[in-house]
Curated annotation (Swiss-Prot):
It catalyses: GTP + H2O = GDP + phosphate + H(+). It holds the Pfam family GTP_EFTU. GTP hydrolase that promotes the GTP-dependent binding of aminoacyl-tRNA to the A-site of ribosomes during protein biosynthesis. It comes from Pseudomonas aeruginosa (strain UCBPP-PA14). This is Elongation factor Tu. The gene is tuf1. Gene3D superfamilies: P-loop containing nucleotide triphosphate hydrolases, Translation factors. Residues 174-176 are annotated as: G5. Belongs to the TRAFAC class translation factor GTPase superfamily. Classic translation factor GTPase family. EF-Tu/EF-1A subfamily.
Length: 397
C-alpha cells in the first residue's frame, strides 16, 4: 500500500530532545522518525544524517541543530536535536527553536548526570512548559529495582525545578532496539510508539499566535497631515480590528487610544493579523507621544517592567563577542524587540566575573520600563554589537 500523502491539516507541535551527552538523544531522534514512518507514514532519517547537524545563525550566534519531522496518528511534530551541550544552551536561550514540550532522555544505566540537571533547569528558566521522560538503554539494565531507583531520581530532579515530577510520564525503553526494529519485552518499537502517544496526550496543542491577545512592537512612527499618527510594525500575535481600543506600553506611562485604520501596502484593511507588516492609525495620538521600542497591545494584556531575573548566554570571542570577562556592575544595552535600553547587571552570589562563552543567571535593572513577560528574548549589546543573548525567566518589578 502506498503511503498517504502528507497532510498539512494536522495540528503542528514543536518538541526536542534534551539530556546528558551520550544518553541517546540522537539515537532516540532517529528511532522516532523510523517508528513513526513505519507506523503512521512519513519519512525516516538515519542517525548520521541527524548527527551531522548543520550550522545556523540565530541573532549572530552559531548553533548546530538538527531539525527532523514526524507524524503521529493525530499530530505533526517538528523536532530539534543538538549535538553538543553548548548548542542546547544557545538554542534554548535564544529561542532559535522554541519547544512546546521536551523529551528528556536519561540513560537507565547511568541515571541523572550534570547535564540532565542543567537541561531541566534551562527548561524551567526559558519556559519549556512540559517535559516527558524517556529512560533509555533499558536493554542494559536487568534489575527492576535499579530502574525504579533511576525513575525516582529523575522525578525528584524534576520536582526540584518546579516541574510536576510525580505526574510526569516516564517511558522505559531502548532507542537502539527501536531503531533496529526490535521489540523484546516491549522496550523497543512499542516503547517509542508509546512515547509518541504520550506526547500526543500530555503536551497540549499550543495556542497559535493568531489566537493570542494582540501585540505589535512599534518600529516607526509617522504623522499624516489631516489623518493623525500612524505606527508601523509586524504584528507579533493576535488580530487588530478598526475601532478597537489599544494600549501603548513601555518607556513612558501607559496610554490608551483607538485604532482608526489599518493599512498594508498602501491599501486599507479591516484588520491586521499576526505575521503581517501593517501601519496602524491612532486616534488623537500625537507624533511625539509614541516611539520605537514601545508596543501596541490589547488593553490589560502586558505591563511595563524594569527589573527581572534572566538566563543569559555570553558570546565567545570566536562568535564576535567580548574578548574579556565582565564583572558585577556591568552596564550594557538590552535590545528588546525594536530598541536598546541600558541596564545594570547583578550577578549571583559567589560569582565574581562572567567569561565569554558562559551561560549565567542574573538580575537586570533597566533605566526605562519595557513591555515584557516571562519568556521574552533579548540581545545584549555594546555600542550596537551583540555580545550576548538572554531570556526573561522571572519578572521582579
Amino acid at each position: 500500500m502506498a503511503k498517504e500523502k502528507f497532510e498539512r491539516n494536522k495540528p503542528h507541535v514543536n518538541v526536542g530532545t534534551i539530556g546528558h551527552v551520550d544518553h541517546g538523544k540522537t539515537t532516540l531522534t532517529a528511532a522516532l522518525t523510523k517508528v513513526c514512518s513505519d507506523t503512521w507514514g512519513g519519512s525516516a532519517r538515519a542517525f548520521d544524517q541527524i548527527d551531522n547537524a548543520p550550522e545556523e545563525k540565530a541573532r549572530g550566534i552559531t548553533i548546530n541543530t538538527s531539525h527532523v519531522e514526524y507524524d503521529s496518528a493525530v499530530r505533526h511534530y517538528a523536532h530539534v536535536d543538538c549535538p553538543g551541550h553548548a548548542d542546547y544552551v544557545k538554542n534554548m536561550i535564544t529561542g532559535a527553536a522554541q519547544m512546546d514540550g521536551a523529551i528528556l532522555v536519561c540513560s537507565a544505566a547511568d541515571g541523572p548526570m550534570p547535564q540532565t540537571r542543567e537541561h531541566i533547569l534551562l527548561s524551567r528558566q526559558v519556559g519549556v512548559p512540559y517535559i516527558v521522560v524517556f529512560l533509555n538503554k533499558a536493554d542494559m539494565v536487568d534489575d527492576a529495582e535499579l530502574l525504579e531507583l533511576v525513575e525516582m531520581e529523575v522525578r525528584d530532579l524534576l520536582n526540584t525545578y518546579d516541574f510536576p515530577g510525580d505526574d510526569t510520564p516516564i517511558i522505559i525503553g531502548s532507542a537502539l532496539m527501536a531503531l533496529e526494529g526490535k521489540d523484546d519485552n516491549g522496550i523497543g518499537v512499542s516503547a517509542v510508539q508509546k512515547l509518541v502517544e504520550t506526547l500526543d496526550s500530555y503536551i497540549p496543542e499550543p495556542v497559535r499566535a493568531i489566537d493570542q491577545p494582540f501585540l505589535m512592537p512599534i518600529e516607526d512612527v509617522f504623522s499624516i497631515s489631516g489623518r493623525g499618527t500612524v505606527v508601523t510594525g509586524r504584528v507579533e500575535r493576535g488580530i487588530i480590528k478598526v475601532q478597537e481600543e489599544v494600549e501603548i506600553v513601555g518607556i513612558k506611562a501607559t496610554t490608551k487610544t483607538t485604532c482608526t485604520g489599518v493599512e498594508m501596502f498602501r491599501k486599507l484593511l479591516d484588520e491586521g493579523r499576526a505575521g503581517e507588516n501593517v501601519g496602524i492609525l491612532l486616534r488623537g495620538t500625537k507624533r511625539e507621544d509614541v516611539e520605537r521600542g514601545q508596543v501596541l497591545a490589547k488593553p490589560g494584556t502586558i505591563k511595563p517592567h524594569t527589573k527581572f531575573e534572566c538566563e543569559v548566554y555570553v558570546l565567545s570571542k570566536e562568535e564576535g563577542g567580548r574578548h574579556t570577562p565582565f564583572f558585577k556592575g556591568y552596564r550594557p544595552q538590552f535590545y528588546f524587540r525594536t530598541t536598546d535600553v541600558t541596564g545594570n547587571c547583578e550577578l549571583p552570589e559567589g560569582v565574581e566575573m562572567v567569561m565569554p562563552g558562559d551561560n549565567i543567571k542574573m538580575v537586570v535593572t533597566l533605566i526605562a520600563p519595557i513591555a515584557m513577560e516571562d519568556g521574552l528574548r533579548f540581545a545584549i549589546r555594546e555600542g550596537g554589537r551583540t555580545v550576548g543573548a538572554g531570556v526573561v525567566a522571572k519578572i521582579i518589578e
